[in-house]
Amino acid sequence: MPEVLTLGVKPNFTDYSEKERELIAGAAMILYPTANYAQFFTTLGKPFFPSLETCLYADEKIKQTTLFSMLGIPHPRTRIYYHLHHQDIVRDFSFPFVAKLPRASSRGRGVYKIETPEQLEAYLRRTPVAYIQEYLPHERDLRVILVNYEPILSYWRHRDPANFRANLHQGATPRFVGIPQEALSLARKAALQCKFNDVGLDLIRCRETWYVIEANMEYGREGLAMKGMNLKQILRDKLLSGELMPASNGQGNAAAAGRAAGVA
């Protein structure tokens, strides 16, 4: 991306050279800062992409669930249990249910279908904070990738019959046809409500209702690659068109800090 200068992430701002600090200060926009730098840039009034919310809610299932609840976004019944309340889980949920690691459970890892007390005990040995969710029977889920709140790709993920997780890394099969507009509208509305402007949302239809399961900020690129789509080029086009920048900034070069090294 020739319009972007990649500086990389450094733990101390003073580790950047004087020239690099000048570039950051003068950039029209910062691309893909870390969550820490995103907070600093917010205070400074420096435009950046993606949004602060996208950065802060990444890999934070507990925060996402609370946000969905507060915003009224349809989401499976979910409760959080700290160690002293682990015994309440079987009172509140009937087997089977889903248990997830609150963090580091991407690509289908750290997600468990709990069918017995023994499986629950094994899960609780993995995490002091239990994230418990009702099990929604399904044969497939829907991944919707949105950039700047607009869906750029959506596809079904048909799960492997031997695996309850509909994830490509867990053997699911992608299908790109028959995507319902109702689901795309919900995904776009949820992204706007949450202010997630670079995200892969997972949705499931169960009992005639669409549910938003979770938001993935580090969404996989496999689906994009299958359709011959280049995310870097998509972002470049949106950057040059001014879509990613406030209108007052116009079009121009953007100095990239933090995670931009993975995009530029």
Question: What do these predicted regions represent?
Answer:
Residues P33-Y37, T54, P151, R157-H158, ...:
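Short glycine-enriched loops at secondary-structure junctions
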Residues F196-R207:
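A short glycine-rich, hydrophobically flanked beta-strand micro-motif that places a catalytic Asp/Glu
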Residues P102, Y135-L136, I145, D202-I204, ...:
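Anionic group-transfer/hydrolysis microenvironments
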Residues M1-I80, Q87:
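Conserved N-proximal alpha/beta basic substrate-recognition cap immediately N-terminal to
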Residues C55-D141, Q181, D237-S241:
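Active-site nucleotide/adenylate-binding loops and adjacent lid/helix of ATP-dependent enzymes
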Residues F97, L153, Y211-I213:
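Protein kinase-like catalytic core scaffold
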Residues R205-A264:
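C-terminal active-site "lid" helix and adjoining low-complexity regulatory extension at the edge
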Residues V111-A191:
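Phosphate-binding site of ATP-dependent enzymes
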